[in-house]
């Protein structure tokens, strides 16, 4: 009885081994040089010639780019006028916050002198300093769905504390919209008005996709504490470009935002009179306000950093290339020389 069962049990065991081996083989991934990391690779040896040539090529590319970038930046004509302190009457400078929160006249006149001929278009910016739009609570205090669609005007959960007024939703809600910049500028030259075009200052993608054409302001700036500018309740949010520009928050505490464009040339030596309303409260957080008039170049606005960065990197690479060249010529070293091994250089070394 037992002898007759032995072959069958051994056959079953062999069958199970074969089936388990087949299962393992069926799950094995297809062999390829890519999955096994066996692709051919080139590993260049860093010989002195290669190192010197690399540094030299970088310097030859970067130094001219730095010079070109600096020249492009120097072609930009810029007028910057800080007015937050100058537009406070002497009698009120001891308590600037009380002045800016008062109801008195805050009109101020500034005179700007054009240093060089400025070709159109001339961009008018306002610049704020020490204003942290990147604060987490500030950045989150908005409702993108509410800005896009009138159906979502009640989506105000993220907008506290500027979410509703009298139980009705505020549109647009949140701290970003509530703190909308509200200083205004009226420019003139030779006693004639200088038109500042405020159309087309916002990104087209923001106007078309982030702010609805059928969404209108509601209950905006009706609270006890006014944060900034008011909005026209008869204009859809997609047409309120000052708001759209402001809602694109800045990453750094010093930033500029586009106010408008001057579409006529300004000649050297001309006096530009600016009548401004100093309404925006930057005094509570020791902020600064500046009015900026600027042209542009093919590289953008005035920014010396890019050119200086290119010149610095190119100069360092050139110095390193020169140093390695001198070392190679004065004290050359044969590649792969075993005398430089530690146990050959130091007696008894390991």
Swiss-Prot record:
It is a multi-pass membrane protein. Pfam families: CDC50. Associates with ALA3 to form a stable complex. Interacts with ALA2 in a heterologous system. The chain crosses the membrane at residues 51-71, 305-325. Keywords: Acetylation, Endoplasmic reticulum, Glycoprotein, Golgi apparatus, Membrane, Transmembrane, Transmembrane helix. Belongs to the CDC50/LEM3 family. This is ALA-interacting subunit 1. It is found in: Golgi apparatus membrane; Prevacuolar compartment membrane; Endoplasmic reticulum membrane. Expressed in roots, leaves, stems, flowers and siliques. Found in petals and sepals, but not in reproductive tissues. In siliques, detected in the upper part of the seed pod and in the area between the seed pod and the stem, but not in developing seeds. Strong expression in vascular shoot tissues and in stomatal guard cells of young rosettes leaves. In roots, expressed in cells surrounding the xylem and in central and peripheral columella cells. Required for the lipid transport activity of the ALA/ALIS P4-ATPase complex. Residues 1-32 are annotated as: Disordered. One of its GO terms (biological process) is phospholipid transport. It comes from the Eukaryota. Residues 1-22 have a biased composition (Low complexity). One of its GO terms (cellular component) is Golgi membrane.
